[in-house]
Amino acid sequence: MRRFLPLIILLSVIFLFLFGTFKKNTRVIPTPLIGQEVPVLGLEVAFYEDFEANNLVEILKSDKIKIINFWASWCLPCEVEHPILMGLSKKSDFIIIGVNYKDTEEGSAKFLNEKGNPYDLVVIDDEGMMGIEMGLTGVPETFVVNEDGKI
Protein backbone atom coordinates (compact mmCIF):
# COMPACT_ATOMS: atom_id res chain seq x y z
CA MET A 1 0.00 0.00 0.00
CA ARG A 2 2.85 2.39 0.83
CA ARG A 3 4.38 2.01 -2.60
CA PHE A 4 1.11 3.22 -4.23
CA LEU A 5 0.90 6.32 -2.02
CA PRO A 6 3.04 8.57 -4.30
CA LEU A 7 1.01 7.44 -7.31
CA ILE A 8 -2.28 8.20 -5.52
CA ILE A 9 -1.02 11.66 -4.49
CA LEU A 10 0.17 12.40 -8.03
CA LEU A 11 -3.14 11.31 -9.57
CA SER A 12 -5.05 13.39 -7.01
CA VAL A 13 -3.04 16.51 -7.85
CA ILE A 14 -3.54 15.96 -11.59
CA PHE A 15 -7.28 15.43 -11.09
CA LEU A 16 -7.64 18.61 -9.00
CA PHE A 17 -5.67 20.62 -11.56
CA LEU A 18 -7.72 19.36 -14.49
CA PHE A 19 -11.00 19.85 -12.63
CA GLY A 20 -10.07 23.45 -11.84
CA THR A 21 -9.16 24.31 -15.44
CA PHE A 22 -12.25 22.72 -17.03
CA LYS A 23 -14.58 24.54 -14.68
CA LYS A 24 -13.66 28.06 -15.84
CA ASN A 25 -14.93 29.62 -19.04
CA THR A 26 -12.01 31.72 -20.25
CA ARG A 27 -14.15 33.43 -22.90
CA VAL A 28 -16.21 35.19 -20.23
CA ILE A 29 -14.48 37.92 -18.29
CA PRO A 30 -16.43 38.65 -15.11
CA THR A 31 -17.13 42.28 -14.35
CA PRO A 32 -18.41 43.87 -11.17
CA LEU A 33 -20.05 46.57 -13.32
CA ILE A 34 -23.06 44.49 -14.39
CA GLY A 35 -26.11 46.07 -12.77
CA GLN A 36 -24.16 49.22 -11.87
CA GLU A 37 -24.36 52.73 -13.32
CA VAL A 38 -21.76 53.79 -15.85
CA PRO A 39 -18.80 55.45 -14.11
CA VAL A 40 -18.57 58.83 -15.82
CA LEU A 41 -15.63 61.14 -15.64
CA GLY A 42 -15.39 64.66 -16.99
CA LEU A 43 -14.52 63.59 -20.51
CA GLU A 44 -14.35 66.01 -23.40
CA VAL A 45 -17.15 65.62 -25.93
CA ALA A 46 -15.60 65.74 -29.38
CA PHE A 47 -18.73 65.85 -31.54
CA TYR A 48 -22.35 64.88 -31.37
CA GLU A 49 -25.38 64.71 -33.64
CA ASP A 50 -29.09 65.31 -33.11
CA PHE A 51 -28.91 65.87 -29.37
CA GLU A 52 -29.98 68.78 -27.25
CA ALA A 53 -27.62 67.47 -24.57
CA ASN A 54 -23.97 67.51 -25.49
CA ASN A 55 -22.54 65.84 -22.43
CA LEU A 56 -22.24 62.20 -21.56
CA VAL A 57 -24.01 62.41 -18.20
CA GLU A 58 -27.18 63.88 -19.72
CA ILE A 59 -27.23 61.37 -22.57
CA LEU A 60 -26.78 58.43 -20.19
CA LYS A 61 -29.97 59.60 -18.44
CA SER A 62 -31.90 59.11 -21.69
CA ASP A 63 -34.67 56.51 -21.58
CA LYS A 64 -33.21 54.71 -24.62
CA ILE A 65 -30.79 51.80 -24.56
CA LYS A 66 -27.21 53.00 -24.95
CA ILE A 67 -24.34 51.17 -26.62
CA ILE A 68 -20.93 52.39 -25.43
CA ASN A 69 -18.16 51.39 -27.81
CA PHE A 70 -14.49 51.93 -26.94
CA TRP A 71 -12.41 52.30 -30.09
CA ALA A 72 -9.30 53.92 -31.55
CA SER A 73 -8.14 54.92 -35.02
CA TRP A 74 -4.94 52.86 -34.58
CA CYS A 75 -6.88 49.69 -33.69
CA LEU A 76 -7.17 47.12 -36.51
CA PRO A 77 -10.01 45.12 -34.86
CA CYS A 78 -11.90 48.43 -34.50
CA GLU A 79 -11.60 48.88 -38.25
CA VAL A 80 -13.04 45.39 -38.79
CA GLU A 81 -15.90 46.08 -36.35
CA HIS A 82 -16.72 49.48 -37.87
CA PRO A 83 -19.08 48.28 -40.68
CA ILE A 84 -21.17 46.46 -38.06
CA LEU A 85 -21.53 49.67 -36.06
CA MET A 86 -22.42 51.54 -39.26
CA GLY A 87 -25.24 49.03 -39.83
CA LEU A 88 -26.45 49.41 -36.24
CA SER A 89 -26.44 53.19 -36.54
CA LYS A 90 -29.26 53.02 -39.09
CA LYS A 91 -31.62 51.83 -36.34
CA SER A 92 -33.09 54.44 -34.03
CA ASP A 93 -33.93 52.18 -31.09
CA PHE A 94 -30.77 53.06 -29.20
CA ILE A 95 -27.97 55.60 -28.82
CA ILE A 96 -24.44 54.66 -29.86
CA ILE A 97 -21.73 56.40 -27.85
CA GLY A 98 -18.16 56.15 -29.10
CA VAL A 99 -15.36 56.48 -26.58
CA ASN A 100 -12.19 57.30 -28.46
CA TYR A 101 -9.60 55.49 -26.34
CA LYS A 102 -5.98 56.69 -26.02
CA ASP A 103 -6.09 58.34 -29.42
CA THR A 104 -5.74 61.81 -30.85
CA GLU A 105 -8.71 63.92 -31.87
CA GLU A 106 -7.13 64.34 -35.31
CA GLY A 107 -6.69 60.58 -35.76
CA SER A 108 -10.24 59.84 -34.68
CA ALA A 109 -11.71 62.59 -36.89
CA LYS A 110 -9.78 61.27 -39.91
CA PHE A 111 -10.92 57.70 -39.20
CA LEU A 112 -14.59 58.73 -38.95
CA ASN A 113 -14.42 61.03 -41.98
CA GLU A 114 -12.98 58.24 -44.13
CA LYS A 115 -15.11 55.35 -42.88
CA GLY A 116 -18.28 57.08 -41.69
CA ASN A 117 -19.50 58.02 -38.22
CA PRO A 118 -21.82 55.47 -36.59
CA TYR A 119 -21.83 57.33 -33.26
CA ASP A 120 -24.45 59.70 -31.95
CA LEU A 121 -21.86 61.07 -29.54
CA VAL A 122 -18.07 60.73 -29.43
CA VAL A 123 -16.09 61.42 -26.28
CA ILE A 124 -12.32 61.55 -26.00
CA ASP A 125 -10.63 59.33 -23.40
CA ASP A 126 -7.06 60.22 -24.36
CA GLU A 127 -5.60 59.23 -20.99
CA GLY A 128 -7.65 56.02 -20.70
CA MET A 129 -9.31 56.96 -17.39
CA MET A 130 -12.84 55.95 -18.41
CA GLY A 131 -11.40 52.74 -19.80
CA ILE A 132 -9.85 52.02 -16.40
CA GLU A 133 -13.12 52.79 -14.60
CA MET A 134 -15.03 50.49 -16.97
CA GLY A 135 -12.51 47.66 -16.54
CA LEU A 136 -11.47 47.80 -20.18
CA THR A 137 -9.31 44.89 -21.30
CA GLY A 138 -8.59 46.28 -24.77
CA VAL A 139 -10.20 47.88 -27.78
CA PRO A 140 -12.65 47.44 -29.28
CA GLU A 141 -14.89 46.75 -26.32
CA THR A 142 -18.61 47.41 -26.10
CA PHE A 143 -21.01 47.82 -23.18
CA VAL A 144 -24.80 47.88 -23.29
CA VAL A 145 -26.56 50.25 -20.88
CA ASN A 146 -30.28 49.84 -20.23
CA GLU A 147 -32.94 52.54 -20.02
CA ASP A 148 -32.23 52.97 -16.30
CA GLY A 149 -28.55 53.71 -16.92
CA LYS A 150 -27.32 50.31 -15.68
CA ILE A 151 -24.73 48.20 -17.48
Question: Could you tell me what each predicted segment is?
Answer:
Residues 30, 35, 56-59, 134-135:
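Short secondary-structure boundary/capping segments
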Residues 64-66, 70-74, 138:
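Short pre-active-site segment immediately N-terminal to redox-active cysteine/selenocysteine motifs
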Residues 67-68, 96, 142:
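Hydrophobic beta-strand anchors of alpha/beta hydrolase catalytic cores
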Residues 70-87:
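Conserved redox-active cysteine motifs that mediate thiol-disulfide chemistry
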Residues 90-127, 139:
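Conserved segment of the thioredoxin-like fold in thiol-based oxidoreductases
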